[in-house]
Amino acid sequence: QFNARAWVQMAKDAGMKYITITSKHHDGFCLWDSKETDFDVMSTPFKRDILKELAEACREIGGIRLCFYHSIMDWHHPDYNERRTWEKDRPVAGTERNRYISYTKKQLK
């Protein structure tokens, strides 16, 4: 039942100047059609790019900005960080920090 135009219009009618949405939280799940991972909204039964729809609605309606909170942390990615004492399901060693940085930069383009 997600309706980007309705969200944007409601925000504008309430006098808001911007909308902020979490594009990717620490769990690594992406609310857009990511080319870098299948851990995204397009791999769910919903199969719609939420961020794209919100961006289009903001442009069409006008007068309201769209902002993103994008977590650099990504617990889902195997190269994010080596395991800390409370994380039993992550490797103790062997993560590739540079590979994770490259992955993150590609997502931000």
Region annotations inferred by a language model:
Residues 1-109:
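Mature catalytic domains of secreted/periplasmic carbohydrate-active enzymes
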